[in-house]
Design a protein with these regions (language model features):
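Class I S-adenosyl-L-methionine-dependent methyltransferase catalytic core
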Residues: 1-180
Length: 180
Protein backbone atom coordinates (compact mmCIF):
# COMPACT_ATOMS: atom_id res chain seq x y z
CA UNK A 1 0.00 0.00 0.00
CA UNK A 2 1.38 3.38 -1.01
CA UNK A 3 0.51 7.05 -1.33
CA UNK A 4 -0.64 7.45 -4.93
CA UNK A 5 -0.21 11.16 -5.61
CA UNK A 6 0.84 14.51 -4.18
CA UNK A 7 3.62 15.52 -1.79
CA UNK A 8 4.11 12.00 -0.40
CA UNK A 9 3.68 10.18 -3.71
CA UNK A 10 5.23 6.72 -3.76
CA UNK A 11 5.83 6.44 -0.02
CA UNK A 12 4.96 2.94 1.13
CA UNK A 13 2.62 2.82 4.13
CA UNK A 14 2.75 0.09 6.74
CA UNK A 15 -0.15 -2.31 6.89
CA UNK A 16 -1.24 -4.51 9.78
CA UNK A 17 -0.81 -8.25 9.94
CA UNK A 18 -4.01 -10.25 9.68
CA UNK A 19 -7.39 -9.38 8.23
CA UNK A 20 -8.87 -7.15 10.95
CA UNK A 21 -8.14 -4.06 8.83
CA UNK A 22 -9.24 -3.98 5.19
CA UNK A 23 -7.29 -1.23 3.39
CA UNK A 24 -8.96 0.39 0.39
CA UNK A 25 -7.62 -1.03 -2.88
CA UNK A 26 -5.36 1.32 -4.88
CA UNK A 27 -7.79 1.35 -7.81
CA UNK A 28 -10.69 2.42 -5.59
CA UNK A 29 -8.52 4.96 -3.75
CA UNK A 30 -7.37 6.48 -7.06
CA UNK A 31 -10.99 6.76 -8.21
CA UNK A 32 -12.13 8.27 -4.91
CA UNK A 33 -9.51 11.00 -5.02
CA UNK A 34 -10.18 11.74 -8.69
CA UNK A 35 -13.83 12.30 -7.77
CA UNK A 36 -13.10 14.66 -4.85
CA UNK A 37 -9.91 16.30 -6.16
CA UNK A 38 -11.41 19.80 -6.32
CA UNK A 39 -12.68 19.54 -2.73
CA UNK A 40 -9.22 18.82 -1.29
CA UNK A 41 -7.20 22.07 -1.35
CA UNK A 42 -7.03 23.42 2.22
CA UNK A 43 -9.78 21.02 3.39
CA UNK A 44 -10.16 19.73 6.92
CA UNK A 45 -10.75 15.98 6.69
CA UNK A 46 -12.19 13.47 9.15
CA UNK A 47 -11.04 9.89 8.50
CA UNK A 48 -13.48 7.92 10.65
CA UNK A 49 -12.71 4.19 11.03
CA UNK A 50 -9.20 5.19 9.90
CA UNK A 51 -7.52 1.76 10.02
CA UNK A 52 -4.09 2.39 8.47
CA UNK A 53 -4.78 6.08 7.90
CA UNK A 54 -4.23 5.71 4.17
CA UNK A 55 -7.28 7.77 3.11
CA UNK A 56 -6.55 10.75 5.34
CA UNK A 57 -2.85 10.60 4.44
CA UNK A 58 -3.72 10.57 0.73
CA UNK A 59 -5.96 13.61 1.33
CA UNK A 60 -3.13 15.55 3.01
CA UNK A 61 -0.71 14.50 0.28
CA UNK A 62 -3.11 15.94 -2.30
CA UNK A 63 -3.60 19.29 -0.57
CA UNK A 64 -5.84 18.94 2.48
CA UNK A 65 -4.60 21.17 5.30
CA UNK A 66 -5.49 18.81 8.17
CA UNK A 67 -6.82 15.32 8.86
CA UNK A 68 -8.32 13.91 12.04
CA UNK A 69 -7.91 10.12 12.26
CA UNK A 70 -10.30 8.17 14.49
CA UNK A 71 -10.10 4.46 15.23
CA UNK A 72 -11.14 2.38 18.23
CA UNK A 73 -8.11 0.07 18.15
CA UNK A 74 -4.81 1.01 19.76
CA UNK A 75 -2.80 -1.00 17.22
CA UNK A 76 -4.48 0.92 14.38
CA UNK A 77 -3.73 4.27 16.03
CA UNK A 78 -0.09 3.25 16.50
CA UNK A 79 0.10 2.29 12.81
CA UNK A 80 -1.49 5.60 11.72
CA UNK A 81 1.09 7.55 13.77
CA UNK A 82 3.88 5.53 12.16
CA UNK A 83 2.48 6.18 8.67
CA UNK A 84 2.15 9.89 9.44
CA UNK A 85 5.80 9.91 10.49
CA UNK A 86 6.82 8.13 7.25
CA UNK A 87 5.07 10.84 5.23
CA UNK A 88 6.17 13.73 7.49
CA UNK A 89 2.51 14.77 7.99
CA UNK A 90 2.50 14.60 11.80
CA UNK A 91 1.97 18.38 12.08
CA UNK A 92 -1.09 18.28 9.81
CA UNK A 93 -2.86 15.50 11.66
CA UNK A 94 -4.32 14.31 14.91
CA UNK A 95 -4.97 10.68 15.88
CA UNK A 96 -7.78 9.86 18.30
CA UNK A 97 -8.33 6.43 19.82
CA UNK A 98 -12.07 6.24 20.31
CA UNK A 99 -15.05 4.36 18.94
CA UNK A 100 -16.93 6.32 16.29
CA UNK A 101 -20.13 6.85 18.31
CA UNK A 102 -18.37 8.36 21.34
CA UNK A 103 -16.15 10.48 19.10
CA UNK A 104 -19.09 11.88 17.12
CA UNK A 105 -21.13 12.50 20.28
CA UNK A 106 -18.35 14.73 21.69
CA UNK A 107 -16.93 16.24 18.49
CA UNK A 108 -16.91 20.06 18.31
CA UNK A 109 -14.66 20.35 15.23
CA UNK A 110 -15.87 21.21 11.71
CA UNK A 111 -14.76 19.37 8.58
CA UNK A 112 -15.07 19.86 4.83
CA UNK A 113 -14.75 16.16 4.01
CA UNK A 114 -15.70 13.09 6.03
CA UNK A 115 -14.38 9.71 4.87
CA UNK A 116 -16.33 6.66 6.07
CA UNK A 117 -14.85 3.25 5.38
CA UNK A 118 -16.06 1.09 8.28
CA UNK A 119 -15.71 -2.68 8.60
CA UNK A 120 -17.97 -4.29 5.99
CA UNK A 121 -19.46 -6.81 8.40
CA UNK A 122 -20.96 -4.27 10.78
CA UNK A 123 -23.85 -1.78 10.78
CA UNK A 124 -21.47 1.07 11.50
CA UNK A 125 -21.94 2.89 8.18
CA UNK A 126 -25.63 3.73 8.47
CA UNK A 127 -25.31 4.49 12.19
CA UNK A 128 -22.37 6.84 11.56
CA UNK A 129 -24.20 8.57 8.69
CA UNK A 130 -27.25 9.10 10.87
CA UNK A 131 -25.15 10.58 13.68
CA UNK A 132 -23.21 12.87 11.34
CA UNK A 133 -26.41 14.27 9.85
CA UNK A 134 -27.77 14.99 13.33
CA UNK A 135 -24.75 16.92 14.60
CA UNK A 136 -23.08 19.99 13.15
CA UNK A 137 -19.56 18.86 12.22
CA UNK A 138 -19.71 19.17 8.42
CA UNK A 139 -19.32 22.58 6.81
CA UNK A 140 -22.10 23.74 4.48
CA UNK A 141 -21.33 22.30 1.04
CA UNK A 142 -19.09 19.68 2.64
CA UNK A 143 -19.07 16.07 1.51
CA UNK A 144 -19.30 12.64 3.05
CA UNK A 145 -17.70 9.79 1.10
CA UNK A 146 -18.69 6.24 2.00
CA UNK A 147 -17.20 2.93 0.94
CA UNK A 148 -19.26 -0.25 1.12
CA UNK A 149 -19.55 -3.67 -0.49
CA UNK A 150 -21.71 -3.90 -3.61
CA UNK A 151 -24.14 -6.32 -1.96
CA UNK A 152 -24.91 -3.92 0.92
CA UNK A 153 -27.65 -1.43 0.12
CA UNK A 154 -27.37 1.99 1.69
CA UNK A 155 -30.61 3.72 2.59
CA UNK A 156 -30.20 7.43 3.11
CA UNK A 157 -32.91 10.02 3.56
CA UNK A 158 -31.72 12.79 5.82
CA UNK A 159 -32.91 16.40 5.51
CA UNK A 160 -30.16 18.85 4.63
CA UNK A 161 -28.10 16.30 2.68
CA UNK A 162 -28.18 15.27 -0.96
CA UNK A 163 -27.03 11.88 -2.17
CA UNK A 164 -25.13 12.64 -5.34
CA UNK A 165 -24.01 9.43 -6.97
CA UNK A 166 -22.86 5.83 -6.53
CA UNK A 167 -19.56 4.84 -8.16
CA UNK A 168 -19.03 1.09 -8.63
CA UNK A 169 -15.57 -0.50 -8.76
CA UNK A 170 -15.75 -4.28 -8.86
CA UNK A 171 -17.33 -5.36 -5.57
CA UNK A 172 -16.91 -1.91 -3.97
CA UNK A 173 -19.26 1.09 -4.09
CA UNK A 174 -18.34 4.69 -3.27
CA UNK A 175 -21.26 6.99 -2.45
CA UNK A 176 -21.06 10.77 -2.05
CA UNK A 177 -23.37 12.94 0.02
CA UNK A 178 -23.26 16.74 0.09
CA UNK A 179 -24.51 18.97 2.88
CA UNK A 180 -26.94 21.53 1.47
Amino acid sequence: MRVISGKARGIVLRTPNGMETRPTADRVKEALFSIIQFELPCARVLDLFAGTGQLGIEAISRGASFAQFVDAREDACRLIRENLKRTAFENQANVVRCDYANYLAKCKDKFNIILLDPPYIEVFLENALKMITEIDILQSGGIIVTERPLEKELSFDFPGFTRSKDYKYGKTVLTLFRKD
